[in-house]
């Protein structure tokens, strides 16, 4: 988490944009749309452009030389591939110089089933693959599918695995009521991880007030 030197409502648009991972993940996007959205994110000064891994070569030229980097997602949005498959995908995208972070999805079926050892072991191998190339890993939980105890326990899985961030939502979950990055969920995650890793809010951040509130939370 960034060390706050001022309140969010005192920040410039550029400073606020530096907290944003600009999502360009919808499967129906054409390559033309992906390029235009990538350009938009760079122009705004977003921290990263979050893209599907098949578009690395397409998007890389548009972030090179800018303050914006790429954040490819792996095994997204379900997190149910084999560990070997996840690791291979991470190794492919992590080789790009323009990659700052890689987003992966924890197997929330395992989480809901109480199989936390499997969750930790899976994440640990993914983290090792990313760190080998100097890339950070953000682990998405799908907090809307979990209760408080499951969220807290998964935070500990991520810490044990060496993850750099814990993250709330993919934005693609179905079958559950969408709440995303509520202040309540963010507070729970921050309590559990302490200074051992960072927390990233994603999903259902629809208003300026909500966005600024999350920044002020740290």
What is the role of each PLM region?
Residues 24, 53-55, 74-78, 106-110, ...:
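Active-site-proximal loop/turn and secondary-structure-junction residues that shape catalytic pockets
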Residues 9-27, 36-41:
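Generic N-terminal amphipathic, Lys/Arg-enriched alpha-helix
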Residues 43-101:
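Active-site cofactor/substrate anionic-group-binding motifs, chiefly glycine-
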